[in-house]
Amino acid sequence: MFVRVVDFVSRPGKTRSLNEIIQSRLFPIFRVQPGFVDEIVLESDVEPNRVVALSFWNTREQAERYNQETYPTVKEVLAASLEADPVVRTFNVVNSTTLT
């Protein structure tokens, strides 16, 4: 399994709006992507404008395909709520309670 970790900084006062957009407009896009497994969105308890999204994919190739073909549209949808460009990092899942 493969994970994309996307770190967002919302515009001041836009964190709730950002989370609502992710849930209402982006979750449906994620669900139809080949290899998509799950999306978890975290809101910082100490930095009010920070949101981190973890998307889980069956393979690195499927995540990369999403990154090339769909992610540019996702960034456009979120642009009005963001203070800066999101930072994307990728990881291999090496341990998980759901995989054992």
Map each language-model feature to its residues.
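Short, surface-exposed ligand-recognition loops at beta-strand->loop->(often short) alpha-helix junctions
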Residues: 9-22
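A short, mixed-charge helix-start or loop-turn motif at secondary-structure junctions
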Residues: 8-9, 56
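Intrinsically disordered, low-complexity segments enriched in polar/charged residues with Gly/Pro
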Residues: 14-16, 27-29, 41-44, 65
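Short, charged/polar surface micro-motifs in flexible loops or helix N-caps
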Residues: 12, 47-48, 58-63
